[in-house]
């Protein structure tokens, strides 16, 4: 295929979108007409998973096509090594313009990620990269110790327009402005490309759009909030009376984030705000699609809509992400393209690491053999794909849990291996809300052993977790394990004793927050 005949690619990635909170997934209240129309024009996946339910490692994984443990992307702030190939760089080197607008969460000195051009709104300095080998005082004393419960209680309405130094980013007020500005940039890019095509200068391109909604804080303009509050709210299962059978590591997370015992009015308020954020997000998706159609680009463009991870949204008495429940680690995924089936649903498990080979497949480029993912196109087209695994894999390394976890979804079961703790096991076909942990039942012992054996062909859990803890500064000079949740008295006592006082702070090279631009050469 000649370069001039290659289709274009648009990837729209939201942040923290619960996989079931869309109209095309059968949600009873949510208004997502643009995502619904996109799903009708393409294929949607019901078992799509993030490879890590945290922003930075998920994004570094899907742009490199490698699992987080392959690139040492453990948590927020882990920089991507400049030597790592990204699909954006591979396209650029092949002469295909790759453009990025909005959030990708690059840290360190590799800010462009190989994109030909980008325009991003740089966040506040709290997400600067931290050293690879130095324990980080800021990790325990800084953003990790924020009272996350307060974001729930403060959820609701914000002003439509705010002044924020023209950066469009304000954590206290939410990310509505960020997404409006980023969508403006994406629309301008499409106008440029549409005009070039009309002038006989057609060249293939790929555009990545990183939107912040519906990431916390749960703040949304009044008109979106009023669509749902107070009555159009689906109360989450197991929210008011959290399951007594929660895994002890999940209970650690619940306690660490202070999320227990939310009242029904508090839940209705925050969920209504979240729903409003989804509809606001959908409006921006609609603006991008409308511009594609206006420029006669829609029919010849591959479009991927996805999110970096999900949102617990009150299920199991939890909010945010980090755990292996489907609300957290599951993601929405829609793929539309020329000559692909319309209105199709696929239930086979897939993960976002497949994005890399999918984009290269569209572009007619080869994927390196060390990438664990596979293109979605043969699956969508109904072809044979003998190398595609029949499982989904995800992992988590951070201190909301005291122990790292690794997840497999296979044959209708979800298995989560916790380092130095018992596993969990759910039958997703019979128990889709994941209320009944089967791991302690004798009849599932063989299945647990089979799952663990499979996991160990993918990763060495103990070795990887030790490497992650060392990188994150959670192993002391004498081998002490500082994997502590933020509410632990021991954590506070260590800080009081000055254990971390001599350790390095964030490097200061990054500069002030604001709009950063790289223009195509």
Predicted regions and their residues:
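Residues forming the ATP-binding cleft of Hanks-type serine/threonine protein kinase domains
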Residues: 429
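A contiguous, mid-protein "functional segment" used to position or interact
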Residues: 441-486
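Formylglycine-dependent sulfatase
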Residues: 1-418, 423, 432-453, 484-521
């Amino acid at each position: 295929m000649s370069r001039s005949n290659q289709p274009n690619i648009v990837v729209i990635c939201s942040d923290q979108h619960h996989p079931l909170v869309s109209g095309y997934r059968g949600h009873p209240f949510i208004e997502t007409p643009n995502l619904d129309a996109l799903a009708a024009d393409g294929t949607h996946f019901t078992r799509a998973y993030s490879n890590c339910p945290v922003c930075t490692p998920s994004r570094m994984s899907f742009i490199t096509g490698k699992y987080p443990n392959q690139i040492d992307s453990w948590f927020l702030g882990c920089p991507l090594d400049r030597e790592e190939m990204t699909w954006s760089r591979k396209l650029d080197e092949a002469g295909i313009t790759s453009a990025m607008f909005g959030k990708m969460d690059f840290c360190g000195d590799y800010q462009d990620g190989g994109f030909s051009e980008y325009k991003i709104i740089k966040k506040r300095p709290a997400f600067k990269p931290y050293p690879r080998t130095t324990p980080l005082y800021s990790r325990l004393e800084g953003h990790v110790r924020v009272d996350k419960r307060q974001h729930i209680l403060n959820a609701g309405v914000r002003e439509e327009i705010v002044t924020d130094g023209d950066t469009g980013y304000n954590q206290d007020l939410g990310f509505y402005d960020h997404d409006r500005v980023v969508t403006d940039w994406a629309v301008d890019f499409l106008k440029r490309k549409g005009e070039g095509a009309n002038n006989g200068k057609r060249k293939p391109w790929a555009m990545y759009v990183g939107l912040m909604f519906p990431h916390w804080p749960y703040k949304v303009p009044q008109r979106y909030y009023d669509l749902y509050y107070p009555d159009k709210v689906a109360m989450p299962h197991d929210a008011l009376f959290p399951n007594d059978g929660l895994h002890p590591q999940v209970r650690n997370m619940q306690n660490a984030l202070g999320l227990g015992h939310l009242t029904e009015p508090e839940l209705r308020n925050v969920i209504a705000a979240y729903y409003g954020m989804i509809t606001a997000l959908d409006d921006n998706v609609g603006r991008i699609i409308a511009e594609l159609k206006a420029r006669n680009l829609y029919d010849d463009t591959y479009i991927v809509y996805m999110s970096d991870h999900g949102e617990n949204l009150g299920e199991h008495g939890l909010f945010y992400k980090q755990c292996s429940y489907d609300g957290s680690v599951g993601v929405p995924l829609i793929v539309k393209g020329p000559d692909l089936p319309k209105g199709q649903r696929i239930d086979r498990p897939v993960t976002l690491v497949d994005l890399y080979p999918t984009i290269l497949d569209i572009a007619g480029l080869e994927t390196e053999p060390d990438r664990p993912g596979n293109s979605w196109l043969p699956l969508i087209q109904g072809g044979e794909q003998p190398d595609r695994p029949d499982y989904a894999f995800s992992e988590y390394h951070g201190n909301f849990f005291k122990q790292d976890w690794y997840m497999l979804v296979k044959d209708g079961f979800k298995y989560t291996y916790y380092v130095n703790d018992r596993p969990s096991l759910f039958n997703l076909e019979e128990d889709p809300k994941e209320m009944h942990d089967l791991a302690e039942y004798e009849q599932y012992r063989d299945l647990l052993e089979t799952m663990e054996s499979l996991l160990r062909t993918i990763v060495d859990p103990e070795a990887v977790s030790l490497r992650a803890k060392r990188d994150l500064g959670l192993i002391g000079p004498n081998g002490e394990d500082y994997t502590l949740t933020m509410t632990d008295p021991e954590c506070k006592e260590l800080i009081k004793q000055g254990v971390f006082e001599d350790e390095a702070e964030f490097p200061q090279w990054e500069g002030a927050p604001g709009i950063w631009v790289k223009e195509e050469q």
